[in-house]
Amino acid sequence: MDAQLEWASSLVPKRQLQQQQQQQEQQQQQQQDFHKDQLMTVGMRIRQRVDQGYASRTPSTSDASLQPGVIRDYSSVIVPQFTRSPLPTANSLPPMLINQRTMSTEASSLEKWDVAEPAAEHETMVNGSKRRL
């Protein structure tokens, strides 16, 4: 009977230890979930701050700069009366690049390099004379 009491009394601390471990694991899981949620919403929070015009209060900002929704447009100051020029239409061909020695009819092609004779594959020209390989 003493062995049974001793065994029963040893179970109580083990159960308490298991419960404490489970509680700690649950707390760690909740913290991990919280951090994952924070990371998943970073992009949304950044866009929200940009939309608000950086109206968050930081120690280095003054009260005058904390007007919500104010985004200053400096485009007219940087480039006064800026207008976008239209792009050329793609209906016409681009101009030919012509040099003194090149013409559009003399474009490089593989026909110049084709070998007329099958036996010529094994011959090469060295100093004007044919040599077999």
Curated annotation (Swiss-Prot):
Specify the taxonomic lineage: Eukaryota, Fungi, Dikarya, Ascomycota, Saccharomycotina
**Which family is this protein grouped under?**
Belongs to the DIF1/spd1 family.
Q: What does this protein do?
A: Mediates the nuclear localization of RNR2 and RNR4, 2 subunits of the ribonucleotide reductase.
Question: What sections of the protein cross the membrane?
Answer: none
Q: What is its main location?
A: cytoplasm
Where can this protein be found?
Cytoplasm; Nucleus
Q: Under the cellular component aspect of Gene Ontology, which terms does the record hold?
A: cytoplasm; nucleus
The annotated region (Disordered) lies at: 1-40, 109-133
Q: Does the keyword Phosphoprotein apply?
A: yes
The protein depicted here goes by the name: Damage-regulated import facilitator 1
Provide this UniProt record's keywords sorted from A to Z.
Cytoplasm, Nucleus, Phosphoprotein
Q: How does it assemble?
A: Interacts with RNR2 and RNR4.
User: Per the UniProt entry, what species is this protein from, by scientific name?
Assistant: Saccharomyces cerevisiae (strain ATCC 204508 / S288c) (Baker's yeast)
